[in-house]
Design a protein with these regions (language model features):
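HotDog/MaoC-like acyl-thioester-processing domains
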Residues: 2-21, 94-195, 270-328
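Residues that form or immediately flank small-molecule/cofactor binding pockets and catalytic motifs
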Residues: 153, 204-206, 265, 287
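Beta-strand-rich interaction surfaces with strong enrichment in secreted/lumenal proteins
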Residues: 101-103, 228, 263-264, 268
Length: 328
């Protein structure tokens, strides 16, 4: 892959939105929630026990925060082959992912997915494009937004890309309904926080059966597969990051947005398992907005899983940090 010179994509003033001609309604099933939680190793009771989820203020069994990324991937991968020119099977490299959360998905949700192609850049031997998918519940409420950055070799978009007013409207309609931790005893007061404060680290030991199971889960029924950076799919790493932050903040809905750029390394070959150490650090606090920015680093066998990763967290959701209290 070469950096090359970017050929700018001309943005035309089209009469219609450049929303992809694709919409799908997905039913969030409890068995899928439990399976997803099992594969990423998230044992929070809200993902397995409806009563525990209701006790935390959810309407039913709560999906892990990045469960929605599976819906995003499936929506993107079903529409992209209809928009790309080129011979042979479509192969994509997933390099970046962001997820903005209004609320967590719960069992019984019927979610509509609308896919928007936001940008495309042509290089000498590949095309880079950003795809944003809007998740809307049956009441018409925008509950989550996800943006993926993908690289494609040998395929180009058939159409030019235009800014979509509908996408900007959807962004404006996303209002995080944040949940404070059920147990407030661990909360950290705003005046005790500052840039540089570290969260306790956590060690995750991935199982190859879970990596393989995750691949099957997210690719089941798709017309083609995507090449993920490293041995573990990017979205699995995304799930591990959310698992780590959820364990640190004590509530699965504490984080309102996740951002990650995936590296090209995770676990070694099929005969070995390498521990992954996650660490978090407060990098900024917006007092007026009541939000903190957290940088996340994950290292396996001396190599990083992310080029960079971060999250936004309401300060009321951040617990007191004790460097001597790692979680496994």
């Amino acid at each position: 892959m070469h950096s090359g010179t970017t050929n700018p994509v001309v943005r035309l003033d089209l009469p219609d939105d450049r929303r992809a001609p694709f919409a799908e309604h997905c039913l969030v099933r409890p068995e899928h929630i439990r399976r997803f939680a099992q594969l990423i190793g998230d044992d929070h009771p809200a993902h397995t026990d409806p009563a525990a989820a209701v006790a935390l203020g959810f309407a039913g069994l709560a999906a892990p925060p990045t469960f929605a990324s599976m819906l995003l991937l499936r929506a993107e991968r079903r529409i992209l082959p209809t928009l790309l020119d080129g011979a042979g099977p479509v192969r994509l490299l997933h390099t970046d992912q962001t997820l903005q959360i209004g609320r967590l998905l719960v069992a019984g949700d019927v979610i509509a997915t609308d896919v928007y192609i936001e940008s495309a850049e042509q290089f000498s031997d590949y095309e880079k494009f950003c795809v944003t998918t809007v998740l809307t519940d049956k009441s018409g409420v925008v509950v989550q937004l996800g943006t993926s950055t993908l690289l494609s070799c040998g395929h180009r978009f058939r159409h030019r890309i235009a800014t979509s007013p509908a996408l900007e409207t959807a962004r404006a309609r996303l209002h995080p309904a944040t949940h404070t931790p059920h147990d407030r005893q661990g909360s950290l007061e705003l005046h005790r926080l500052g840039p540089g404060d570290e969260l306790p680290h956590s060690i995750i030991r991935p199982r190859h059966s879970d990596v393989a199971g995750f691949r099957r889960l997210v690719h089941d029924g798709l017309p083609y597969r995507i090449s993920a950076a490293g041995a573990a799919p990017g979205l699995l790493r995304f799930g591990w990051m959310a698992r780590y932050l959820g364990s640190r903040f004590g509530h699965p809905a504490a984080v309102t947005s996740y951002r990650a750029e995936f590296s090209h390394y995770c676990v070694r070959g099929p005969a070995s398992v390498a521990d992954i150490e996650f660490r978090g650090r407060i990098t900024d606090i917006d007092v007026s907005a009541g939000m903190a920015e957290v940088a996340v680093n994950a290292v396996s066998a001396g190599r990083r899983l992310f080029v960079r990763a971060s999250a936004s967290v309401p300060v009321t959701a951040i617990p007191s940090t004790r460097p001597d209290s790692p979680v496994r």
